Amino acid sequence: MAEGETMSKTTGMPQPVMLTGEKPRAMATVITRVVEALTGEKSGIINFASGAVSVNYSDVSPSPVQAGALAANYSAEFLNRINVLPVKAIEGESVMVGSGGPLAYVNNRGERRNPQAGATMTPHRYQCRKVNFDTFISHDDLDAWTHLENYPELAKAAVDQRRNLDRLLIGFNGTHYSSPSDPETYPERQDCGVGWLEKYRQEARKKVISGLSVAGRDEGGKIVSYGDYGTIDALVLDGWQSAIAPQYRMDLVAVCSLNTLYRKEYPYVNAVVPNQPNMELLVNQIMLNNPTLGNLPAMPVPFFPDNAVLVTSLRNLSLYWLEGSTRTLAKDEPEYNRLSVYESWNEAYMVERYEAGCLIDAIFWR
């Protein structure tokens, strides 16, 4: 960490450090530092736009006191909980080796012993596809924030966070890969790759439970419209109990959206009355601080569909990236009044063992 730089206790991200006793940095210096922060390369080996090797910008006049911090956004912490693995081939097979059935048996009669298969191999094909994560910073923004010593670190943290959030967006909503992609038609980046949920739909239909309904309730919790299940808990519990074999049930979680948890929890929270403080405390501690879904720990994540729940262990989900495929080009583009960073990765979303999870899909809330 640079001298004088501080870290936020809540976000762990770099916090702004004001320059003191010196004139704000020249634009060219800021561009150099931003490029180095975003690309990890010294600006001397970056290919800038033609004629922009030495850009003469006047120093920015002193501005009113400003402070910068990383804007509030969704968390991409989910990526730290799953496998993010480098691979050497752009496509191939991922093989999971597991144990077969029981091996123990008794044969004391001198008959031929018949060994059982002690290991099973489950291959799944993967293909890493290129996805672009291009971004730019306008010259106006660079002008406005040259007086912040750690503006490059803040910019890098924001870009890194957005890139990881886009990976979640594709992982939970991606249905196909199309070049070029169409952000207007597919705002949730459905055409930027096949995500984890779609992998279940395409490759493990027997592990997809689809089209079931949950009863509708009024604010008092009374059923006003009957469904296949009285609660979302009952649907999820019955789903994973029937679809996932016992040997895969040890560390399951229910991945869902925040709206799904809200639908479950609101009737209980709404029923709490002021003259029942113990009940209010119980609801807060058990339900809100330690949410569950279908008797499993609930893991709400950004961009997850409101009509689905993925039950799996987190180590069953992977994001593969192709070694040596990351390409980054930083260009100062004065003709567009911006500093652009062009970046691409080759990635693939993988479910290691379909039998170790299930997708409850197309849930209908009555």
What are these regions (language model features)?
Residues 2-48, 54-67, 191-217, 223-226, ...:
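Sequence/fold signature of self-assembling virion shell proteins
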Residues 52-136, 156-157, 189, 193:
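Assembly/oligomerization interface modules of large self-assembling protein complexes
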Residues 92-93, 98, 179-187, 365:
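Short amphipathic alpha-helical patches
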Residues 132, 139-235:
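Alpha-helical scaffold segments that mediate packing/assembly in large oligomeric complexes
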Residues 170, 254, 265-267:
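Transmembrane alpha-helix/helix-exit interface in multi-pass inner-membrane proteins
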Residues 248-254:
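Oxyanion-binding "anion nests"
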